[in-house]
Amino acid sequence: MHEMALTENVVDIVLRNATMAEAKEVTRVHLQIGELRDIVEKLMTDCFHYIAKGTIAENAALEIERIPLIIQCRNCGEKKHLKLHTGDGRTTTCEKCGMSNFHIIQGNEFLVDDIEII
């Protein structure tokens, strides 16, 4: 259950930034999490509310935006969206040139994108 450790870091970042801004309350936290990250959103939300209890972030809404996994062919530059858990990535070849040499463009992110305070 790595969601707990990740969420502890998120709450720490949120509280440090809210304290620096002299906030009275954190009302919303927006995360951007890539599809490649193996995160259970419900579990992360539950962990967030558990960890934030008793802090100025205890009533904050946690919003999680999933970032699609996009790969790019190193040979021709063609980009492709991969869907995880479909076996899509195991035998992927470029539809344009037929090669199978890719690198990740996006989908591995884990960002605290926005913190709303009052």
Residue ranges and their predicted role:
Residues 71, 89-92, 110:
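Cys/His-enriched microdomains
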Residues 114-118:
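Short hydrophobic/aromatic patches at helix-to-coil boundaries
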Residues 30-32, 93, 111:
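Conserved beta-strand segments that form the floor/walls of ligand-binding pockets within enzyme
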Residues 81-82, 102-103:
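Short functional micro-motifs and their immediate structural scaffolds
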Residues 73-76, 94-97:
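Short cysteine-rich clusters marking metal-coordination/redox-active sites
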Residues 1-65:
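Long, charged N-terminal interaction/targeting segments
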Residues 61-69, 83-88:
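Short, flexible, mixed-charge glycine/proline-rich loop motifs
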